């Protein structure tokens, strides 16, 4: 993997890679160090307790948060496959059938009819998958809602409710061992774990009875892994506040977790847009495309030789006609690389996948805009290289700014908040 590939991955705010870099490599170590520093202002013992709790909390939570949802979804997909359904069938295709005229370019019935004409085995298998879902829509929707519930509820319960209880129990045990010289009549609060039976009953009941309306099921099916992580982060906030050892710790957890959600899922998107807009204005270039595209020699050569083929317009029909009829065009290849469209091994578009027309239209606009800007420059190759370097710098700057806010500003602000509400620098739960 090249440096450009790595930068491209961490610059994709729709994926988990930016979260992985910020959370594990920068945010967690910084939070641990700040927690130790602030608690040491009160005592070394509290600093040790805070450090241990923070190490367990940060890294175990990161492992569950970043790995839990993808892992559960993978298991759920295997389960759905064993039941005879292909989890690649996007439920949004049912909603597309309601469109009329030139706006109707995809859908369950539409795709079955359109792609049945192909004799390729992978296409016929895909059509068979569509027919199976069409004939058993209610059953398939239940599988999708169960998948969503499992992928969000299970990690959230573990991170938000189980882990804090275990962490607090460990701290109490350490304190008991530390204070063995105290009189025997000094009582310590016992740890009450979550009721396993109750959790099991809850999970079975939810997976048996949970039913969402078609529209909501379609919305759920459209959620990316990073969207589900944001939802689980909201549940994590509720869990951390509700399991707090006292109200002061609850206030601090609410302050910390809400700030973290904003800085993880909202701020980076606006920082990226702002940096790209600033770069376009300052350097008179176009940095809206991904670095992988800007670094592609075939793409640059095609611009120089005026061999780039594009859809006639941004209309749904023109876009879909183009990607279906010209799968080997640079536009279609990059659309697939950027996950705007998916092709089967035979080169035919996968009829089970939903194509976000608005997203594809925006991509076409950015693609065309860069080509026009490059042609207007005196040196296309130099223009593209400059755009790539600036885009990479923007991505790294975004990671740096976001990480500074998450790993430096937020923890410092949290301890200022704790000092303001408690009069002490130590974590409220360690009182």
Positions of predicted regions on the chain:
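Glycine-rich, hydrophobic membrane-spanning regions of integral membrane proteins that mediate transport
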Residues: 1-431
């Amino acid at each position: 993997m090249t440096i450009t590939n790595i930068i491209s991955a961490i610059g994709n705010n729709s994926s988990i890679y930016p979260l992985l870099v910020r959370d594990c490599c920068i945010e967690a170590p910084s939070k641990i160090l700040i927690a130790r520093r602030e608690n040491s202002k009160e005592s070394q013992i509290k600093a040790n307790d805070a450090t241990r709790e923070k190490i367990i909390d940060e890294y175990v939570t990161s492992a569950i948060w970043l790995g839990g949802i993808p892992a559960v979804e993978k298991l759920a997909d295997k389960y759905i496959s064993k039941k005879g359904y292909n989890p690649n069938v996007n439920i949004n295709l049912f909603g597309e059938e309601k469109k009329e005229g030139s706006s109707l370019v995809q859908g369950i019935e539409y795709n079955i009819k359109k792609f049945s004409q192909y004799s390729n085995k992978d296409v016929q298998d895909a059509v068979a998958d569509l027919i199976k879902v069409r004939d058993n829509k209610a059953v398939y929707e239940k599988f999708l809602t169960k998948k969503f519930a499992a992928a969000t509820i299970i990690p959230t319960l573990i991170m938000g409710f189980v882990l804090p209880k275990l962490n607090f129990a460990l701290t109490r045990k350490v304190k008991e061992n530390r204070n063995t010289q105290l009189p025997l009549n000094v009582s310590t609060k016992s740890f009450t774990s979550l009721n396993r039976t109750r959790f099991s009953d809850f999970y079975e009941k939810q997976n048996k009875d949970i039913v969402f309306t078609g529209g909501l099921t379609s919305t759920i099916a459209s959620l990316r892994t990073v969207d589900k992580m944001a939802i689980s982060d909201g549940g994590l906030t509720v869990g951390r506040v509700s399991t707090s050892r006292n109200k002061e710790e609850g206030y601090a957890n609410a302050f910390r977790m809400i700030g973290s959600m904003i800085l993880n899922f909202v701020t980076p998107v606006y920082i990226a847009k702002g940096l790209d807009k600033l770069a376009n204005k300052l350097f008179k270039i176009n940095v809206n495309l991904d670095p992988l595209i800007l670094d592609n020699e075939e793409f640059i050569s095609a611009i120089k030789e005026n061999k780039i083929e594009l859809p006639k317009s941004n209309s749904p029909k023109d876009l879909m006609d183009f990607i279906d009829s010209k799968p080997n065009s640079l536009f279609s290849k990059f659309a697939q690389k950027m996950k705007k469209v998916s092709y089967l091994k035979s080169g035919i578009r996968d009829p089970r996948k939903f194509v976000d027309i608005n997203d594809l239209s925006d991509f076409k606009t950015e693609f065309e805009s860069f080509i026009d800007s490059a042609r207007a420059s005196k040196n296309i190759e130099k223009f593209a290289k400059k755009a790539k370097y600036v885009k990479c710098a923007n991505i790294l700057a975004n990671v740096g700014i976001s990480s500074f806010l998450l790993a430096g500003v937020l923890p410092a602000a949290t301890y200022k908040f704790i000092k303001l509400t408690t009069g002490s620098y130590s974590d409220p739960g360690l009182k």
